[in-house]
Amino acid sequence: DPHENLLEGSPFLMMLPAVAGLLGLLAPRGLTFRHGATAPHHDAFKVKRGDPAMVVSEPLPRTFTSVADDMLLSGLNGKAMFVEKADIPTKAQVRAAIPAHCLKRNTLKSMIYAAISLTQSAACLAVGTQIPLKVAALPFWLAYAAVSGTVWTGMWVVAHECGHGAFSDNRALQDVVGYVFHTALLVPYFSWQRSHAVHHSRTNHITEGETHVPVVVNAREGIENTGGELELDNAKRFGKVGWGLVQLVLHLLIGWPAYLLWGATGGPKYGTSNHFVPVKPFSTTLWPNKWPKKVWRSDLGILGMLGMLSLLATKIGAAAVFALYCGPLIFTNMWLVLYTWLQHTDVDVPHLTNEEFTYMRGAFLTIDRPYGPVFDWLHHRIGSTHVCHHIDCTIPHYHAREATQAIAENFPKVYLYDSTPWFQALWRVACNCIAVKLRPSDGRYTWVPVS
């Protein structure tokens, strides 16, 4: 797979679980059981020009044949469950439908966007230095952390593009930019480049997926993640709302460091992997050939950054460093997990067995969502144009909107876009995407309804 070879703003976010919960309760559409519902007629989708993400109009009805009566439905209305392996176009077919210039990288333009994200991030930091380090100023520090962490996510996305080879044809330059930006956010650049390439090559693969792989009911050891029964029991014990809050805390606050340190939410193939230590006692499966050396090179940058922060703490105090740097970093990490969670998970989006999986089928199980103009600007449309990114990750973000339009127009049967507001979708996923079960008839793993 070619991916294996690639260099791979809002203060209320601190209270995101509670806010999302309230919003979810106010907007329950899509959370109810849909007995006798109708599904999209795949040939009836009509394309609307304008926002490339919002391209699918109301479909004509057809009786469900592939969605169980007890399956919850998202804004996709079960669409992903009707897509068969034979429906998926080849990568060459999709690339042919995308305007040729969208596949080209412009180094100057990429550097300008990198400079914009860097400048915005530095401006936030400058504002933070003016906030007094007093308990009375805590509300201002919370607002600073939320806004700054949201803005810093733009730097994260720039580094993400560098890791994919979407930044520039000058690979040395893009590695320097990506390494510096990711290291500044305590992300091991080359380590994550490798694991993220695996994620792209095995999206929604139940065994070999690298992130957000669910636990399975009646799981087979070594093939599926075990623990589905336990998770469902926990959900029943806490209640749907209670467990949804637990899920939000675990994912948004702990999820990113847990993934880096022991491969949390990964599939069983790669075991307990560590992005900083590519040797035993951790699993080494994720780090073949040249990659252990690259992991160590990533570690040098992280150690250097930690050293700089420690030195700064001796000058201005540990509390000041935590307030200025660690607070925003928590929010940046929250945004990262939020995006990846919602890009590949919803109540009616399946995972696949090895027999049913193909690279392009996994790519077309990615979901585009609306995040609004502010977040789209700050985060370079990483959430609203992610389908095209999974089809060809070398498409730069400034061409992704046009590429998405082409994909949606030419492949409406398989392109997934859910217009549900992101905070409602987040609450729906947190409350209901707990564990999956295998449907032997079609090799799909579907979410077990939570009562």
Name the predicted role of every residue range.
Residues 377-410:
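C-terminal, well-structured subdomains that either form a transmembrane helix-short loop-helix hairpin
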Residues 271-298, 340-378, 386:
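Multipass alpha-helical transmembrane domains of eukaryotic endomembrane proteins
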Residues 14-40:
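N-terminal chloroplast transit peptides
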Residues 11, 35-150, 182-326, 398-451:
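Non-catalytic, topology-defining segments of multipass membrane proteins
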Residues 147-159, 188-192, 253-268, 325-355, ...:
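Transmembrane alpha-helical segments that form the membrane-embedded catalytic/substrate-channel core
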Residues 142-145, 165-179:
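Membrane-interface motifs of alpha-helical transmembrane segments
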Residues 2-12:
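Extreme N-terminal basic, low-complexity initiation segments
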Residues 152-171, 192-205, 339, 343-347, ...:
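Acidic (Asp/Glu-rich) catalytic motifs at the cytosolic membrane interface
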